[in-house]
């Protein structure tokens, strides 16, 4: 009689096999999701007061970047910053310096490709 049961797996072995199959399938599902870049988002920020409207996190899809705009008033020296995600279709204007339509203001744009690279502790501006 013992030989008859030697070929059949025990209940615990069957459960382990099922659990292993489920875990392998779950890991394959998670591998298929693209990795999003996490960026700092603040729509109105000054160096003196920080983020005025509250900050949060945005997710940039693969091939996209984090971005910070610096709007500089050349006469008063006050700076306003906007930080957000930049989709790959919009990355043509990632690094530029141009005058604003408003006299005396300049706009500097900078993109970066690391996690939270545009948050206040990590960002560096190269301003002429």
Curated annotation (Swiss-Prot):
GO terms for cellular component: external side of plasma membrane; extracellular region; protein-containing complex. Residues 37-128 form the UPAR/Ly6 domain. It is found in: Secreted. InterPro entries: LY6_UPA_recep-like, LY6G5C. N-glycosylated. It comes from the Eukaryota. Residues 1-29 form the signal peptide. Its main location: secreted. Keywords: Disulfide bond, Glycoprotein, Secreted, Signal. Glycans are attached at residue 73. GO terms for molecular function: identical protein binding. The keyword Protein biosynthesis does not apply. Pfam families: UPAR_LY6. Disulfide bonds join 39-66, 42-51, 58-85, 94-111, 112-117. Abundantly expressed in the epididymis. May have a role in hematopoietic cell differentiation. Forms oligomers. This is Lymphocyte antigen 6 complex locus protein G5c. It comes from Canis lupus familiaris (Dog).
């Amino acid at each position: 009689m013992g030989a008859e049961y030697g070929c059949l797996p025990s209940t615990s072995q069957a459960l382990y096999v099922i659990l292993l199959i489920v875990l392998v399938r779950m890991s394959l599902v998670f591998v298929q999701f693209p990795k999003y870049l996490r960026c700092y988002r603040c729509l109105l920020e000054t160096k003196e007061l920080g983020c005025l409207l509250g900050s949060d996190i945005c997710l940039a899809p693969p091939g996209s970047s984090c971005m910070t705009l610096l709007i500089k008033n050349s006469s008063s020296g006050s700076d306003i910053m906007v930080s957000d995600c930049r989709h790959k279709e919009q990355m043509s204007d990632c690094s530029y310096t141009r005058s604003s339509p408003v006299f005396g203001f300049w706009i500097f744009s900078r993109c970066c490709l690391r996690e939270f690279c545009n948050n206040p502790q990590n960002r560096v501006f190269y301003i002429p």
